[in-house]
Regions:
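Conserved beta-strand hairpin/beta-sheet module of binuclear metal-dependent hydrolase folds
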Residues: 1-39, 112-128, 141
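Glycine-rich phosphate-binding "P-loop"
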Residues: 1-6, 92-105, 164-172
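Structured catalytic core of nucleotide-sugar glycosyltransferases
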Residues: 11-14, 54-55, 99-102
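Short, hydrophobic beta-strand segments that form beta-sheet elements in well-ordered domains
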Residues: 24-27, 48-51, 69-76, 82, ...
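Active-site metal-binding motif and surrounding structural segment of the metallo-beta-lactamase
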Residues: 31-77
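Short loop/helix-cap segments at secondary-structure boundaries that form the rim of catalytic
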Residues: 62-65, 79-85, 94, 133-138
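Catalytic core of the metallo-beta-lactamase
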Residues: 92-149
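Cap/insert and terminal regions of metallo-dependent hydrolase folds
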Residues: 136-172
Length: 172
């Protein structure tokens, strides 16, 4: 199983897990044209797109992906916020990827992380969360997407809520 990162930031998130037969898209936060530019991308191989939560940097391109024939999947709470014909993540079915979702803590409606299995490989994917409440065993890869705000860090430093060394560790 291979990984290609198209975007991991506040302006858009999108990751491709792929093998010789299939592509699994994680997050719908970058334009489809960016996917289509990739030499490894083949629309016929796409198993689907799984989405962690409804925030724009993760889900703003759902309709665009669906218009290209890509089935998108998310949790019930996320589906209720998207106003698109997104399928429940529990319905995702692929010959090459087994996807299990689990709840994470974030300011969204029903955000989830993913435990993905393909052959002998397992990947843990978690984004925009400050804690993972489960223990995962026998992982071959861990993908954690996280951001920070320099303004908030500096404000917390100024107010004594954060030490300078901790702020510096965050930004390095």
């Amino acid at each position: 199983m291979n990984l290609y990162v198209l975007g991991s930031s506040s302006s858009g998130n999108c990751y491709l897990l792929y093998n010789e037969r299939s592509i699994l898209i994680i997050e719908a936060g970058v334009p489809f044209k960016e996917l289509n530019k990739l030499h490894l991308f083949n629309l016929k191989k796409v198993s689907g797109c799984i989405i962690t939560h409804e925030h724009g940097d993760h889900a703003s391109r759902v309709k665009e992906y669906q218009d290209k024939g890509i089935k998108c999947y998310a949790s019930s709470g996320t589906i209720s916020k998207l106003n698109e014909n997104v399928k429940n993540i529990s319905l995702f079915n692929s010959e090459d990827f087994e996807v299990f979702h689990f709840p994470v803590d974030h300011d969204a409606s029903d955000p989830v992380g993913f435990y993905i299995k393909s052959g002998e490989e397992t990947i843990l994917f978690a984004t925009d969360t400050y804690v993972l409440r489960y223990n995962f065993k026998e992982l071959t890869s861990i993908l954690i997407e996280c951001n920070y705000s320099m303004d908030i860090l500096n404000e917390n430093l100024k107010n004594g809520k954060l030490s300078a060394s901790r702020r510096d560790r965050t930004i390095l």
